[in-house]
């Protein structure tokens, strides 16, 4: 379904409810620049470097796009998805079933989730929705539950520290969304709904959190304007 949720002024803060879940795939493909290309980059990289029967857990898996792509690349992977939205998981499970894929899903708040050890954790556009006081604690848990040589892939919308640059990048991003078919009204309405829900950090703040969690080898593998993907390795 086409995302037309914000053709009217929002009556509440943004949440991943049934209305969002029903249009999520269209929404994210039109709202996150190079979403599919970045998803495929990360998936192909993991398929190339991970050992047989590696375990991958997608934290904030939404409609399971990444897990489904990964499952079709490597049949041996053990795949898990966690999300706090029952509506999103309903879509994820339905899609996985349609593809005949064996993916385990958990409905949970990530800050309260009973983590298990994995080779890879993925958090694509997830941390930005976690309340700031809880983010470091969550990253600490992720690091602790990674196997030796484990990997974290983390994609985030980011802030620029320079105010002039930040203003212009934000305007370019709005231009991008207009080119994807969103009106100025829709863009402003969604921004209003996301206020104090999606709270981005700067690149430096994200790197500092990763380092504080224990990661020593961290690289940026994708960036477009105010969107960036980090890969971090556990020693």
UniProtKB/Swiss-Prot annotation:
The top EC class is transferase
CDD domains of this UniProt entry?
AdoMet_MTases (cd02440)
Q: Which HAMAP family match?
A: Cx_SAM_synthase (MF_01589)
Name the catalysed reactions.
prephenate + S-adenosyl-L-methionine = carboxy-S-adenosyl-L-methionine + 3-phenylpyruvate + H2O
Keyword Secreted belongs to the record: no
Protein name as it appears in the record: Carboxy-S-adenosyl-L-methionine synthase
In its UniProt record, a GO molecular function of this protein is: S-adenosyl-L-methionine binding
Keyword annotations from UniProtKB, A to Z: S-adenosyl-L-methionine, Transferase
- Report the function annotation for this chain: Catalyzes the conversion of S-adenosyl-L-methionine (SAM) to carboxy-S-adenosyl-L-methionine (Cx-SAM).
From the UniProt record, give one GO term of the biological process aspect. Answer: tRNA wobble uridine modification
Instruction: Tell me which domain of life the UniProt entry assigns to the organism this sequence originates from.
Output: Bacteria
Q: Which Pfam families match?
A: Methyltransf_25
Q: What is its EC number?
A: 2.1.3.-
The UniProt family comment states: Belongs to the class I-like SAM-binding methyltransferase superfamily. Cx-SAM synthase family.
Binding, S-adenosyl-L-methionine: 35, 60-62, 83-84, 124, 191
Q: How does it assemble?
A: Homodimer.
Q: Does the keyword Zinc apply?
A: no
């Amino acid at each position: 379904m086409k995302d037309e949720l914000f053709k009217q002024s929002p009556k509440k803060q943004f949440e991943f409810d049934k209305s969002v879940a029903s249009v999520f795939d269209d929404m994210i493909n039109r709202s996150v620049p190079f979403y599919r290309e970045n998803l495929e980059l990360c998936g192909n990289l993991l398929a190339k470097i991970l050992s047989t029967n590696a375990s991958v857990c997608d934290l904030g898996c939404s409609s399971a796009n990444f897990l489904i792509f990964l499952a079709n690349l490597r049949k041996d992977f053990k795949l898990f998805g966690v999300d706090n939205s029952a509506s999103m998981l309903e879509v994820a499970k339905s899609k996985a079933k349609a593809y005949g894929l064996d993916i385990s899903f958990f409905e949970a708040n990530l800050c309260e989730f009973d983590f298990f050890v994995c080779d890879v954790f993925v958090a694509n556009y997830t941390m930005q929705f976690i309340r700031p006081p809880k983010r470091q604690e969550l990253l600490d848990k992720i690091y602790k539950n990674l196997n030796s040589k484990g990997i974290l892939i983390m994609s985030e919308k980011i802030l620029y520290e320079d105010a002039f640059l930040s203003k212009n990048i934000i305007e370019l991003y709005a231009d991008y969304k207009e080119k994807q078919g969103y009106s100025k009204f829709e863009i402003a309405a969604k921004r209003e709904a996301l206020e104090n829900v999606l709270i981005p950090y700067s690149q430096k703040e994200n790197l500092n959190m990763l380092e504080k969690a224990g990661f020593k080898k961290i690289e940026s593998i994708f960036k477009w304007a105010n969107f960036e993907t980090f890969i971090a390795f556990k020693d």
